[in-house]
Amino acid sequence: MTKYTNADELKSLTLGQKTEYKHTYEPELLQAVPRSLNRDDLALGDELPFVGCDVWTLYELSWLNQNGLPQVAVGEVALPATSPNLVESKSFKLYLNSFNQTKFTSWDEVKETLVKDLSACAGETVKVDVFPVQRYSQQPIVDMQGECIDDQDIIIDDYEFNAAYLESSTSDAEIEETLHSHLLKSNCLITNQPDWGSVEIQYKGKKIDREKLLRYLISFRQHNEFHEQCVERIYTDIMKYCAPESLTVFARYTRRGGLDINPFRSSHLLAPKDNLRLARQ
């Protein structure tokens, strides 16, 4: 349980509550969560130790054209890590559902509406793309880059979050490598529902012990935080205990409510090169 679970800013969220689905456009459905809740807990100041974004894929995006003919699309959203707020995912789903019976004059109007509303919620300009479904018909399913660290012959008997697994986890050998794990699992901060993800860690610096890194990632298994907060915690813990020269942490979470969230945090990169889904997405 995190220190801010009972924060006042979380009490008004529709997440975890029975809600009515709206079918006509209602931007007020979007709800913001201050990023400061998690960042204060991590003792991060105004100068963030990372850049990056939250990449969302919108698989259930539909509206009516001026003739009343339904349109369907896949949307991609990039929410800057520097924005004061993240967008709460259930409210995002409810907001997108409000497009379903709403007429828009063009696809451009849909995109402009998404940019306007999401930017207002996040507190910073959000990048949005709206694509025809056909664009995704040939999109490959990919694996994460680098070596997978999951197939280790180790015994795990503790599933409580513990950043100390990363203590004394580096050797003197200097290396630049990319590792990934599909064993990332945490729980929703509000509902306790499981969140399933894969995480890619690219770093340059002293070599990180793979067993200790895997034990650390598995320790999120009973941990309650939003996707974005977990990734920022992973980034700051690796920086604290391993002190790499450069670091990028990219997690891709499985889809829920027609949305997947893919937080990306880096010492030097603003966004991932591609938004390509994994097998579980």
Curated annotation (Swiss-Prot):
Binding site for substrate: 87-89, 227-228
Active site (UniProt): 188, 195
Pathway the protein acts in: tRNA modification; tRNA-queuosine biosynthesis
Keywords from the named record: Cytoplasm, NADP, Oxidoreductase, Queuosine biosynthesis
GO CC annotation: cytoplasm
Source species, domain of life: Bacteria
Positions contributing to NADPH binding: 89-90, 256-257
Compartment annotation: Cytoplasm
Example of a GO biological process term: queuosine biosynthetic process
Keyword presence, Protein biosynthesis: no
KW Transferase (keyword) present: no
Enzyme Commission number(s) of this protein: 1.7.1.13
Listed SUPFAM superfamilies: Tetrahydrobiopterin biosynthesis enzymes-like
GO MF annotations in UniProt: preQ1 synthase activity
Top enzyme class: oxidoreductase
The reaction(s) this protein catalyses: 7-aminomethyl-7-carbaguanine + 2 NADP(+) = 7-cyano-7-deazaguanine + 2 NADPH + 3 H(+)
Cited InterPro entries: GTP-CH-I_C/QueF (IPR043133), NADPH_dep_7-cyano-7-deazaG_red (IPR050084), QueF (IPR029500), QueF_N (IPR029139), QueF_type2 (IPR016428)
Family of this protein: Belongs to the GTP cyclohydrolase I family. QueF type 2 subfamily.
NCBIfam families found in the cross-reference section: QueF
Function: Catalyzes the NADPH-dependent reduction of 7-cyano-7-deazaguanine (preQ0) to 7-aminomethyl-7-deazaguanine (preQ1).
Quaternary assembly: Homodimer.
HAMAP family: QueF_type2
Protein name as catalogued: NADPH-dependent 7-cyano-7-deazaguanine reductase
